[in-house]
Amino acid sequence: MEGISALEKNVAELTVMDVYDIASAVGQEFERVIDQYGCEVIGRLMPKVVRVLEILEVLVSRNHINPEMEELRLELDRLRLERMDRIEKEKKHQKELELVEDVWRGEAQDLLNQIAQLQEENKQLVSNLSQKDINLTEEEFQKHEGMSERERQVMKKLKEVVDKQRDEIRAKDRELVLKNEDVEALQQQQSRLMKINHDLRHRVTVVEAQGKALIEQKVELEAYLQTKEQEAASMRLEIGKLRDKLKGEQHTNGEEIKTETLNEESILETEKLSLDLKDSNRPRFTLQELRDVLHERNELKAKVFMLQEELAYYKSEEADEEHKLPQSSPVIDSKAPIPQESGIKRLFSFFSRDKKRMPMMQKNVHFQESFGQWTEYNRDDVYTEQGQEALQHM
């Protein structure tokens, strides 16, 4: 901060020395103007600038003093508020003490009155006993003792019954707590299953959409292949018509022989170009095109297979959950899944657990390795019958 000039500082950080630096800089500028234009140019401006600098000096000095004064004023206000709060608390405490003392005095007076009343009753009972002549016989005394013994036994039995009932109540309370915990756990499990069911239904919808897209792609490929087959059939018909036409136009002279030779050569070239479909060794496509088509076909079949298995698994899981919890998800409305049973599903239900997921992954790896070995084996220009049949059936 030492390299920053006074004019570049923040207003809150200015000091009196910074004001003097500003005044010095302004004075230097005035000297340059005076040297260049004379004193008359700034004669009226200089007193105003000096006054502004004096005001700035006073304000800066106040700003340095005012924070301390403001802090002291705030501290004084805080102490006053604390003192007032303390006085209020003391007054409140004093009132509470007075109320407690009044209550205590009232209770003490009531107790004294009760003691006096009991003393009077005691004196009256003593006087009554002294006046009466109570002569209890021995039989009455034994009878009284027997009654007391029976009462003690009854009280003991009642106490045992009460203790037993208390233990049963405590056991019932513990069972009730456990039942409540089980109910809470079941409710949490129900909410979790509802969430899983919602996610599975969403995934089933996505899988169905993917399956529809793949089916549409398959239909488009089949239509494309049918158009190609129709084009090949039309080319065969044109070749047959050209051949019949050339055979009907043969002549007996030498020019006719030359023309026939030329026609036969053109027919051979046309036949070579049109590709005889009866020849099993005809070059229908290049090797790279054959590989690309077979690879794409196998990928699509694998995707369709995996999507069908996943869809069947999700539908079966949804059916099981709805069978276990028929009223678990009243908010979500969706179509009831149709359970599908197939041998492939029983063999490759790999989406349920991690143990079932591994065989399918190994099968996909084996399929990719076998397809890679087939492409490595067919690197030359030989066309196998299996590849040709696959192209014809696509």
UniProtKB/Swiss-Prot annotation:
> Could you tell me which Gene3D superfamilies the record lists for this protein?
1.20.58.1770, 6.10.230.10
Example GO molecular function term? protein dimerization activity
The entry's localization annotation reads: Cytoplasm, Cytosol; Cytoplasm, Cytoskeleton, Microtubule organizing center, Centrosome; Cell projection, Cilium
Which positions fall inside the RH1 domain?
2-89
| Primary location | cytoplasm
Q: Which Pfam family, just one, is annotated for this protein?
A: RILP
Mind naming one GO cellular-component term on file for this protein? cilium
Spell out the PROSITE patterns in the cross-references. Answer: RH1 (PS51776), RH2 (PS51777)
Q: Give coiled-coil spans as residue ranges.
A: 68-312
| Classification via SUPFAM superfamilies | RILP dimerisation region
What GO biological process terms are annotated to this protein in UniProt? epithelial cell morphogenesis; nitric oxide mediated signal transduction; protein transport from ciliary membrane to plasma membrane
Q: Which domain of life is it from?
A: Eukaryota
Looking at the record, which segments are called Disordered?
318-337
Described purpose of this protein according to its UniProt entry: Plays a role in the regulation of cell shape and polarity. Plays a role in cellular protein transport, including protein transport away from primary cilia. Neuroprotective protein.
Report the family membership.
Belongs to the RILPL family.
PANTHER family of this UniProt entry? RILP-LIKE PROTEIN 1, ZINC FINGER PROTEIN DZIP1
Supply the name of the protein: RILP-like protein 1
**UniProt organism field:** Xenopus tropicalis
Q: What is the lineage of its organism?
A: Eukaryota, Metazoa, Chordata, Craniata, Vertebrata
